[in-house]
Each structure stands twice: as structure tokens, then as C-alpha cells.
């Protein structure tokens, strides 16, 4: 799967892309050499994904819905593990594997990060085109982190 993450990050860094559709399970696999994880995990079992990501002891950024902030788990993670949050002024658009985008996103999402951002909460402007999040917006973000 050639995600927007992979496209943008691989412009300046080596990327090891994995996906469950490739038969690679996040809970069973860890690349031999890697520095940072950026992922869009399923929106179910959020706490399990965070526990697994934290177990590596390496920086990460996971996309999660902002409604998760209402749960007790992220509050505890912000307190105990210094979880970080990259929020946007607009809703992210998600593009399906077949290239279709969804203009009717009913929820907002953020990157929930650990040991990744220069401060605990960052608010960024998200440049959105009619089709998808602008390439420049993602490129700019990944150049600054």
C-alpha cells in the first residue's frame, strides 16, 4: 500500500512500509532497523496500539480521532508518558486504497505522538485541496519535525 505517509516521508528518508493487507501484523512484527513510527492504525483497540507503540521505546505518531480525548486512556498517557498531540485547524481527509477520497468526514483526527514533537501540543494549519490534503502541507510538517 502506497500511503501518503510513505510517499512524503520517503522523499527524504528510508521508509519501511507495512500493512495488515500485506500479511504483516503490527502486534507481531518489528523491523530490524528503524527510528520513528508514523501510522494510521484502525480506530478500534486504540489503547492496545499505544501500548505496543510505547513498548518499542522509539518516537511515534499515530493518527487517532479527537473523540478519543474523552476517554480515560489518553488522559493517563498524557500524564504518565508525556504523550504529545499534533492537532489541525481542519479535518483530515482520508483516501481509500482505491484512490477515492471522502469529502464527508464527520470526525476530526490528530497525530497522537510520543517523543516526536518539540512540545506537548501543537496546532497546525492543514492545507486542503478539493481532492486531498495538499502535498505541501505534509512535506512542510515532516521537514520541521
Task: Label every model-predicted segment.
Residues 1-145:
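Class I S-adenosyl-L-methionine-dependent methyltransferase catalytic core
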Amino acid at each position: 500500500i502506497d500511503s501518503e505517509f510513505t510517499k512524503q516521508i520517503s522523499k527524504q528518508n528510508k521508509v519501511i512500509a507495512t500493512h495488515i493487507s500485506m500479511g504483516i501484523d503490527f502486534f507481531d512484527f518489528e523491523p530490524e532497523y528503524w527510528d520513528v513510527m508514523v501510522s494510521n492504525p484502525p480506530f478500534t483497540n486504540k489503547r492496545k496500539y499505544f501500548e505496543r507503540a510505547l513498548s518499542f521505546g522509539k518516537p511515534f505518531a499515530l493518527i487517532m480521532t479527537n473523540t478519543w480525548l474523552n476517554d480515560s486512556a489518553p488522559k493517563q498517557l498524557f500524564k504518565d508518558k508525556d504523550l504529545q498531540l499534533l492537532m489541525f485547524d481542519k479535518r483530515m481527509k482520508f483516501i481509500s486504497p482505491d484512490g477515492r477520497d471522502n469529502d464527508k468526514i464527520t470526525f476530526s483526527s490528530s497525530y497522537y505522538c510520543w517523543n516526536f514533537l518539540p512540545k506537548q501540543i501543537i496546532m497546525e494549519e492543514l492545507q486542503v485541496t478539493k481532492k486531498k490534503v495538499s502535498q505541501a502541507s505534509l512535506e512542510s510538517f515532516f521537514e520541521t519535525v
